[in-house]
Each structure stands twice: as C-alpha cells, then as structure tokens.
C-alpha cells in the first residue's frame, strides 16, 4: 500500500485525485502509473493535449475531455472514495455528485488503459509534448 501511495505522490501534475487515479491504474493494468503513463504520448500525465499517438494515448485524451465536463469540484485535487471489489472499481455512493463524476472519469481511463494494453508502445513512454499535433476537440 505504501508503494501505491508513493507512486501516486509522484504523479504530481497529472490530473485527477492522484492517489485514487494511481491506485485505479495499477489495479486495472498492473503497471506502475508513473513509469508507464506519466509522460506517455501526447495526453497521458503532464502536458497539454494533442492528437493521440495510439489507443492508449486516446484513453488519456478522453479522460481529459471527461474532466472538462466536471463542475463543482476540482478533479485535480479533491479526493473521493471508491473500492476494489471482485477485481472491479466501484465508486463510493457517498461521494457528492461532482466527485462521483470524477471517480467515473478515473474509472473509465483505468479500464480503457487495461483494455488497450496491446497498443502500449514503449517508444511513446516519454513523448516531448511540444512535438504533438494540435488536439482534436472533445
């Protein structure tokens, strides 16, 4: 558990409740979220949005678009509750509506990253963001 907390803290600059998002990505993919997704493509981790380089990067693009729809809380900082039940993410029912939305955005990106593990390409692990092409609209 301590390792997950350290990984989440290292995700500084990544949008979303860092601790929850990092844990979800690890639980769904088995991958270290900082090492594998912190600088991946044009949309994962820190940096601006750009045209996705592959399906993995598209997951992060959709995640950032999901956050743009959130109102009433700060998806970058505000924490929410969720549980891991039978290998599935369950957003807490006691979360206020805004944080429920943030949790669902984070859940969706974690599942998307798992579903697209086959498209993950180590050559995109560290992408120079200013070389990314203009992003599509959400």
From Swiss-Prot:
GO terms for biological process: arachidonate secretion; lipid catabolic process; phospholipid metabolic process. It is found in: Secreted. The record marks 129 as: Cationic membrane-docking site (MDoS). SUPFAM superfamilies: Phospholipase A2, PLA2 (SSF48619). Disulfide bonds join 42-132, 44-60, 59-112, 65-138, 66-105, 73-98, 91-103. The record marks 128, 131 as: Hydrophobic membrane-disruption site (MDiS). Its main location: secreted. One of its GO terms (molecular function) is toxin activity. Residues 1-16 form the signal peptide. The record marks 122, 125 as: Important residue of the cationic membrane-docking site (MDoS). Expressed by the venom gland. Pfam families: Phospholip_A2_1. Homodimer; non-covalently linked. This is Basic phospholipase A2 homolog G6K49. It comes from Calloselasma rhodostoma (Malayan pit viper). The lineage of its organism: Eukaryota, Metazoa, Chordata, Craniata, Vertebrata.
């Amino acid at each position: 558990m301590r390792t997950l907390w350290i990984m989440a803290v290292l995700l500084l600059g990544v949008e979303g409740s860092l601790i929850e998002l990092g844990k979800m990505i690890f639980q769904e993919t088995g991958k270290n979220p900082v090492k594998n997704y912190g600088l991946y493509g044009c949309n994962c981790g820190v940096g601006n949005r750009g045209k996705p380089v592959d399906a993995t990067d598209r997951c992060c693009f959709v995640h950032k678009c999901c956050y743009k729809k959130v109102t009433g809380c700060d998806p970058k900082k505000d924490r929410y509750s969720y549980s891991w039940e039978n290998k599935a993410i369950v957003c807490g029912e006691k979360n206020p509506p805004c944080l429920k939305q943030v949790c669902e955005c984070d859940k969706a990106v974690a599942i998307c990253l798992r579903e697209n593990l086959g498209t993950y390409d180590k050559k995109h692990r560290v992408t120079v963001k200013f070389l990314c092409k203009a992003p599509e609209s959400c």
